[in-house]
């Protein structure tokens, strides 16, 4: 009877464990693993990590034709997600440069979030990068002013300033500010650079990003 009960409990536990809910973005990470299995990631590439502004930049290599780029952006991700999946996002690669775009969704997920908390989340991810890649170039692209998230801009701008101050003190690190480049002559954000959702940018928007990013690309 005891043996039967033990087997029953073991089977029950196994079933419950197998049905355990996967963490958010688990499938995205599995997709990255599959890509890496199908094609070994090249060494000394530029690794893009972050949220949908990278995910939707599917033709990023066309904007930087002489560079080898690995795009590992996954839409909706927050800095907390980059930290959670840091091993999967960093360990398979041997890049010469990492460029990060993330943080917007942290505020969108929790509008009451303080800029300092987002900055701390970024510092955690930066530290994880440096533990594995102490000497490579690491760059952070500023959170953009998205018309659909106008109510969050004050917090994002504050976080941008703090992240810039942090990056300015770090070796082999740069803060890439795309804010002014996306404004018109009156200092207003160019809505024509955005898709209908007023959140994601158009190919022309990516052209603007490219011009700002080019001096930083290794």
Locations of the language-model features?
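Catalytic His-Asp segment of secreted/periplasmic serine-dependent ester chemistry enzymes
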Residues: 144-218
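Structural recognition of the beta-strand scaffold that forms the well-ordered cores
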Residues: 46-49, 70-73, 97-102, 137-142, ...
């Amino acid at each position: 009877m005891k043996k039967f009960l033990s087997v029953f409990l073991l089977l029950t536990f196994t079933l419950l464990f197998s049905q355990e809910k996967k963490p958010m973005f688990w499938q995205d990470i599995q997709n990255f693993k599959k890509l890496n299995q199908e094609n070994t990631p090249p060494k000394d590439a530029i690794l893009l990590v972050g949220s949908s502004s990278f995910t939707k930049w599917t033709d990023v290599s066309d904007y930087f034709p002489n560079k080898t780029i690995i795009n590992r952006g996954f839409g909706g991700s927050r800095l907390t997600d980059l930290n959670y999946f840091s091993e999967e996002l960093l360990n398979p690669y041997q890049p010469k440069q990492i460029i990060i775009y993330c943080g917007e969704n942290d505020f969108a997920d929790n509008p009451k979030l303080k800029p300092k908390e987002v900055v701390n989340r970024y510092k955690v991810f930066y530290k994880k990068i440096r533990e594995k890649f102490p000497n490579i170039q690491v760059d952070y692209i500023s959170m953009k002013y998205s018309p659909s998230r106008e109510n969050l801009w004050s917090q994002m701008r504050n976080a941008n300033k703090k992240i810039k101050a942090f990056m300015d003190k770090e070796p082999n690190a740069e803060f890439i500010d795309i804010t002014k480049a996306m404004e018109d002559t009156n200092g207003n954000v160019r809505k024509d650079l955005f898709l209908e959702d007023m959140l994601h940018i158009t190919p022309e928007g990516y052209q603007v990003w490219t011009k700002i990013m080019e001096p930083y690309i290794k």
